[in-house]
């Protein structure tokens, strides 16, 4: 990762045109040649950027110096997209710092409480959907994708469970498609559905009820064993 702190201005040309006036900013240049320009204030998003695949070229103008008072810039960085004619040209009028660091291989972001965790905990504690319930399997395969959990309730009825962190109408529609498909299989039918999530929107609750599904609110801390909160089935 190359990190440059500089007084700079920038021009983006191609499918759109944009410019940044001269100001002190931070430039990040990644190993894939992506370039991102950040300022001190504003959102987490860069002010301007060029993403990979692209080529990058450092240009040192003739008579370049590090005096910010002179009109000649220290360096120009030109980034060209390899798929389009888009070009981002950054003029570095004065460079305060230009350093390169090898960050190594990143293990990636590990999220806590996301759908995979919820699925695993609910599979391990399947009686939370009802006393006497038994797990068939996680990621139950179908022709249109895997159902998060397939179970059998105390009455011997198959139960398809769709799990979301935040449950909305799209999740209910997804569960509907699964149940419609599964109910065509005489070895499984009847299959009822449960829509499970940490939060469920009122609209999703109404739609789920209309489709004949139960809604299950998941308390992640309780399932993890760090709280005494209760799940609610309604």
From Swiss-Prot:
Cellular location(s): Cytoplasm
Keyword set, alphabetical order: Cytoplasm, DNA-binding, Endonuclease, Hydrolase, Nuclease
Subcellular location, principal: cytoplasm
GO cellular component: cytoplasm
GO molecular function: DNA binding; single-stranded DNA endodeoxyribonuclease activity
Tree of life domain: Bacteria
The enzyme's E.C. designation: 3.1.-.-
Keyword presence, Cytoplasm: yes
NCBIfam families found in the cross-reference section: PRK03298.1
Function recorded in the entry: Cleaves both 3' and 5' ssDNA extremities of branched DNA structures.
Stored PANTHER family: ENDONUCLEASE NUCS
Family affiliation: Belongs to the NucS endonuclease family.
Classification via HAMAP family: NucS
Protein name stated in the entry: Endonuclease NucS
Lineage: Bacteria, Bacillati, Actinomycetota, Actinomycetes, Bifidobacteriales
